[in-house]
Structures are given as C-alpha cells and as structure tokens.
Amino acid sequence: MPNRREFIKSSTLAAGVTALTITSKGERTLKNKNTIFRKKLSECLGGPWPEGGDLKPKIQKTEQKDGYRLIWLSYELEPNDRCPAILLVPDGVSDKSTAPAIAIWHQHAGQWHLGKIEPAGLAGNPMHHTGVALAKLGYVVLCPDALCFEERQDPQKKLTRGNYERFEFLRYTVAGKCMAWKNILDMRRAIDYLVSRPEVKPDNIGCYGHSMGSTHTWLVGPWEPRIKALVGNCCLPTYGAIHRTKLLHCFPNFIPGIHAHGDTPDIAGLIAPRALHLNLGETDGGSPIQEAREGVTSIAKAYAEAGVAENFSSFIEPKTGHVLSEKMWDHVQNFFSKHLL
C-alpha cells in the first residue's frame, strides 16, 4: 500500500494528466469549430481566390505635399482588371529608411464618385482624410479604389451610381460568388503591392476602414495573414440586427448562405490571433447597438478562447453616431502605434 506522500504525488499527477486531456480536447474542439466555419465561409463567399500574379504596377505621377508625397499609381488585380490607387509616403522614408504601412479601405456613404481621394485628403469630408493623418505619423499609406467607386465605375458609363454597384453584386452572385469575394481579392492584391514597395517594412502592415471600409477590414482579416493589425470604425451590423430593423446595407455585408453557419462577429473572430480593434457609435443606426454589443462580446470570447484576449479591443462611444470622432481617432492612433511601430 502506498504511503500518504506517494498517494498525494500520484493523485496530483493523475489530476494534471486529466486537466491536460480536458484542455487538449477543448482546444481540439475549438480548432475544429473554427476550421468548419472557415470552410463554410470560404464556400459561401465563392471559393478560393486565384493566386496573385505579376502586379504590373504603373506610376502616373508624384506630387510633393507638406511632410509627405502622393504617388498616383495602378496595379493589376486580375487579367484585364486594374486598380487605381494613391500611395502616401512620409518625407524621410525610403528603401534605406523603411516604415510600417497601412492600407485604407474607403467608406461608401452613397458617394460613388469618391474612393481613394477622400482618405488621401484630396476631396470629401476632412474627418476622413485619414491617409494624410497616418502619413504624418510616419506610416506609408495605400488608398485604393473599391469596385464601383471613383475610377472603378462602369467603364461603358451605361450604369451609374448604385445601379452599377447592384449590377456587379448580382453578376458575382449568379457566378456563385459575391461582392465580398471580389473585395477580398482586391484587398489581398493591395497588400501584395504594399509588401512589394522597397520603403515598406513587410512584417509591419496594418489596415483601417470606416463604414464600408470597416466591413472590408473584418472581411479581409481572416484571409490575409500579412496584415498584423486591423482597425474597423463604425460598422458591425449583425444579420440579426439587419433582419430586426429591416436595414439595407452595403453589398459586401451580404454573403449568400452564411447565416446558417454564423454571423458577422464570427467572421471577425477568425482574425485571431492577430490584433483587431473596433470603434462603434452608440447611436449609429448602421450598427444597431444591442446586437453590436453582443457582437463585440462574441469577438472578445473568440480571442480569449484563442489565448490572445489582449489582442482584441473595442470602444463604444456614448451618444455618438456614424462618425470618426476625436476619441475614436485616439484609439486608432494608439492601436497602430502599439502594434506596428
């Protein structure tokens, strides 16, 4: 018969083995759940994206500004499909003195004539001249046009404004894909371009988006591991909220068949373990706050389960709508400084 000390020792070891077994089973269950949802999400989006080929970049012109320069350029997304963009490079940044980079996904706002030029500080609301603000903080910034906006409107000029956007959404849908699938492809090519730039630190890439740009942020996050830090401002509409409030929203939010398997916060949760921050306005009708709060809790849980609770943060500003407020911007700056600088 074992003595008391031996009994305690053997019991402790057995308990440890049991705990490890339970933990291991829990980790496997979580991994399996995420793998299954990721697979379903990929299928609902439209399947795998084509491998990125030669970007075939072209530079149109360069203009010196106060503390940074603007470079108008384009690069290939797919054969016969190019993306116009503007690159902002801070003074003093070069191939010999590299810097972190941030891609900015512009907003929708029913302003199809505005894409890259708003964050680049050339038009639109000064509140959203975020590319300029980030360049002055020392980041290389890429501002591309999303499909259906600015220079990527109907090339035949037959359909205008929302009609062309609706046409493109339906065209991708009947092909077994969706607008989100195309947006993700285009954003991944934007990251291809950023990491190709000699003045960019390829391991220090972030992205930021307001409104539709926020949707683009949590859409691309699960599929682009080169993005180290992601910020979404004012857009986390859940399907539950959309249905409850009969909310008409940007086409990228609508992924055919996905609601049978999960909701938008579940998509954002797949970004873990990489860093994610979300800003929300309490009175923003585009992200009904009841479900948005639940969504933020769900994402936080996903990060905690992945063992990286510290890599997700959120800020809900009281009595604030669909804006980029000073407090929200403080969170954006501090987040990128923490994770990219």
Report the location of each language-model feature.
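N-terminal export signals
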Residues: 6-27
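Alpha/beta-hydrolase fold nucleophile elbow
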Residues: 200-209
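N-terminal cap/lid segment of alpha/beta-hydrolase-fold proteins
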Residues: 54-94
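Short beta-strand element of the alpha/beta-hydrolase
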Residues: 97-107
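Cap/lid segment of the alpha/beta-hydrolase catalytic domain
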Residues: 105-185, 242-244
